[in-house]
Amino acid sequence: EKLSGSDLNYNDKGSTTIDHYKINNYAKEVNGNIDLRKALVKSSNTYFADQVQKIGVDSMIDVSKRFMFGQEIPFELKTAISPIPYNDKTTALELGTAAFGQGKDLVTPLQVALYTSAIANGGNMMKPHIVSEILDPSGKIIEKVTPEVLSKVADKKIMDTMKDYLKSSGDRNFAGFVKGKKVAGKTGTAEKTKDKIHSWVTVFYPVDNPTIVCTAFFEEENKIAAEMIPLVKKLVNKAIELGY
């Protein structure tokens, strides 16, 4: 929200230094001159670590609150609160690492699914439910959950731009997921320790009129997220088979 036009451009040299600490891209990949779209597609750590410095801590706290970080999510099952990883004592390095999902970031799969759904829904984060409707033995609907907006996270124009960017990421990572349809989304890999890796995959389908969000978290699987894509593909296609 704070950056636009040429502010979104960045020369990715494969690494950057913040507070005397070197941050590398995965495999130290050098992406050259990129914008936000390509940074998402290429998962450029350096782009987000440096660009977030222009945005600042206060703006990141504001955005985090709109995405329901630091707040209890109303849900039928107990779920942990995803804390806001920023405060007035946050250093430039902490801000930079949090911007690409490392550092003090702690987030639940439900939170990431809601985050993804907000982008898919043009900025509306919907209140989650386990059951959408209850049927009697004859199949008649006796109770149905009314959709409810939990948070308006950003203007539709901004979210539609993000949706388009995630489509570009999907074209690279999720091509062929569903026959004849496009899937948008993002992969993510976080290093817990040198030998323990967390992997994420989150997608929405179909791109033009989303009805499905699928988020998968693989704890300490020691595999990059791309290796987990086939499982998520099975989940999405099963949901389609069931009529969602």
Language-model-derived ranges and their functions:
Residues 1-218:
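Beta-lactam-recognizing serine transpeptidase/beta-lactamase-like catalytic domain environment
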Residues 108-114, 227-234:
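Short amphipathic alpha-helical face segments that pack within enzyme cores
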Residues 141-143, 229-244:
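Short, gly/Ser/Thr-rich active-site loops of penicillin-recognizing serine hydrolases
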Residues 218-230:
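A short acidic/glycine-rich loop-to-helix N-cap element
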